Amino acid sequence: MDVMKENKMKNIDEYLYKYGLHDCVVERIYVQNNSLVFCFGKGVYNLNENGTETTKTTACLMYLEIENLNKEQMWEHIEISKINKNKINEIDYEKFIEEVNKYKFDILENYLSYFGNSVLLEGYTSKNRYQIKISEISKIEFNFK
């Protein structure tokens, strides 16, 4: 295994065993440089060595760094599915961001995959249920306030 891929996996492992996003609220999502940034105004959960949620952190930003992220071609790395009465439709990144920034995004589940270095977040706004898959993540970083 090459060193770069090993470092990416180590970074994802660090995140996976350190923080939980279940029942956390994303208040805003935006792009900064090569990162997709999620704003958690009420923090995320610290996980103990068994993966159990313990305490909540302070407000934080989660940076999902994606090499060569192009704001005009977000579909290359981000797939968003809107689930409504058992119908699944793919929607634009811009429409999803607009809804999140207006209503917030409550995360029910978060999944990680080494294949494609992906994160899948499942949750809802006050209007709809969504799944958002972000792939080719080179680094995950949390910045606490």
Q: Where do the protein language model's features map onto the residues?
A:
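Surface-exposed, interaction-prone regions used to assemble/regulate multi-protein complexes
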Residues: D2-K145
